[in-house]
Amino acid sequence: MLQIDGSHRFARGWDTHLVQRLHDCEAGKNAVLTGALPGFTSADTTDPHSETHFYAATPKPATQVKWSEEGLPLFSPREVEVNADKLSRPIETMAASSHFTFSHGNLAKVASHDPSFDNAFAWEELWMTYTYWKNGFTLYAPVDNHDPFAFYIQPGMNE
């Protein structure tokens, strides 16, 4: 099951790539792939055929960087710096990313988004992380040495 947030572009074969990465995770049916995706820029973001530049990188796992004034943990993507070239399978990560999650279909049955939330934008990733953890899921970042499979346009990248 794929969940995405915002404008994405996918590389050919993204689905088979993610299925293989999901099967590489030790948590089995309770594995969730997630991470901050590499970016892309496009001459015209409304035209999927416009000239596009994709940044070569793997998804980044999250790390807790500071605390909000309300006492909530704030997460930020980070590069894997030590032995990144030797990774051959996804690694565990501490937080979900709203850029994407990919999992077996049981995630939607057990830990789906709560439809009663009017606006979860500011704390969506924290809620996802807690809900998945509470229901026995393990988060993994597919940071292994493979070609990028998806790209995310972030606000301000085309300005």
Region locations from a protein language model:
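Active-site-adjacent helix/loop segment of glycosyltransferases
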Residues: 137-159
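Conserved catalytic core of nucleotide-sugar-dependent glycosyltransferases
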Residues: 2-4, 8-113, 151-158
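A short, conserved alpha-helix in the catalytic core of glycosyltransferases
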Residues: 18, 107, 118-144
